[in-house]
Every structure is written in C-alpha cells, then in structure tokens.
C-alpha cells in the first residue's frame, strides 16, 4: 500500500495494528497495577520495564503502519537481559503452571497471550505481503511473550506464591 492510502478495516495490516494496540493498552493496565512494587530486575522496576516495552511497541506500530521506524538490536537484548535475570532469581521451571498465582502474575499471563497474538498478526500481514518489517521486529515480538511469561512467574515468586502445575486428570 502507498503512504497515506486508506486500508481496509479487515486487512491483515489493520489486524496487526489492532493486536499491537490491544497489547500496548493492556500493558498500561498492568503498569498501573505494578506501580507499588519495589522489586527490580536489571536495575529496573516493573513499571520501568513495562514503560520501555510500551515505547518499543509504538515504534513497531509505526513500522507496521509503514513509517520509517525500526526496533534496534539493543532493545531485544534488554528483553533478553530481563528474562535471564528473572529466570536466574527463581527455581528452574519443571512444567507448565496454572495462571493466576497473583493478580499481577495473572495480568502478565494475559499480556503474554496478547503478545503472542500480536506476533501472529504481524507475521500474517508479512506473509500476505501487506507489510514489510525488519527481522529485529519479529525477534522483539517473539521475545516479548517470553518476557511476559518470566514476569508472571517472577511476580508470583516475589509474592511468595508457589507455582501449581496442571494435574492432567
């Protein structure tokens, strides 16, 4: 599509932009719920981490909309550093766990599903050849769901809530 051209409300590009907007908006709610937390990962509060992610999602939304904006590799590294620091602070995961240990943990679990949907919608738009995005954008979106998962676990861990595995019975 050409710059300034109207796009269909049902296009893959519009769906991708909508999914990114939903994720960003939901992360705003998570950020409000996280304001009172005092713990830090890589020197950043939970609120700081989410704020950085929201800023980066605006860059990705601009890129998906056709603007000359890209996510830089250092932003992916920031996500990976947070994921690694959270994982090192907790016991290793042995199985899937039930969402909802704490309110914040549950919110991060929902954010994780929004992040995965946004990633799928962006990939769908790329595969439909409606948009073109950089590899770093795809990598960032992929790692973002991992960050949300790590922060869900870390939130529960810091609150002293034990993870509960599904029973499969």
Enumerate the language-model features and the residues they cover.
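Phosphate/pyrophosphate-binding loop motifs in nucleotide- or prenyl diphosphate-using proteins
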Residues: 1-169
